[in-house]
Amino acid sequence: SFDSFLGSGAGTYYGTSGGVTLSVLKCLYYFRTGNDLSNNEVLVKDKEFYKEYRLKIGRNVIRCASVSTMSNLLKVLLIKDEFDFIEVMNCEGGCIFGGGQVVLPTNKKDEIIKARALALKKNMRKGNSFPYKNPLVSELCDKYGDELVDVLHN
């Protein structure tokens, strides 16, 4: 049988650098507070070669970075102790400009990456943007429990 088309908006946004980080922060916030995270609770700053995310939960500040390309990763590794979590995407901007995408003019690369990221962000808003509310994931967790750790994307 085929995979279900049922998914979450959060999964859609995984195609961009920072999508995994936002999903992790949403889950962490929910499991620590019992509440859904609103976007205005995450402070996002564009840095020279990465994005920085900060989220306060109680007295704790969770510090994250998302980085794309290996050359930028090498720079982030020099300051890795500043972060609790680092997301790494090999392709510039994430999968949206990766090897599986149609080859486009490189002189418009930044414009294309931004447009593709915006399209995914809009698509994310249409569906459920909270990974822990995905009914398919809940069903799998109920059925297989700890066995999933070895087979799911992590």
Residue ranges of predicted features:
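Iron-sulfur (Fe-S) cluster-binding modules
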Residues: 1-154
